[in-house]
Amino acid sequence: HYPALGDDVPEGAVRSAQHEDINFITLLVGASAAGLEVMDHDGGWIAVEGNHEHIIVDSGDMLQNLTNGLFKAVTHRVVNPPDATSDRYSMPMFTHPRDDVDLTPLPEFIARTGGEALYPSISAGEFLRQRLIEIGLIDDD
């Protein structure tokens, strides 16, 4: 939920800073207002047009690890839509493998991405734990 903003907040101001999702895949059912943007290959931003008839599929860091970078985690952000005076609702479904699932890059993806593993051998549970520590959501103990 992104609460309505006052008239003094500029259109295009960032509401959720650029990031990639930690999980495997995110499914996003059409948001109630515009604002989602994805980064293109040149570092520019592309507005994502979604509605109640669309499901937006966003690959995350875990999928990037498993595919040795063939499928990149999508860098995205949320900016103020032209009408930021109304609430914006978004219903993401973050999918995670079980903690014991091995996210070691698969041989077929290593072969397709230059022949060398670019990402670590790690379980989904340890991957999530490390990332949550990195962003300060849990302590390293």
Set out the residue ranges of the language-model regions.
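C-terminal flanking tails of non-heme Fe-dependent oxygenases
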Residues: H1-D141
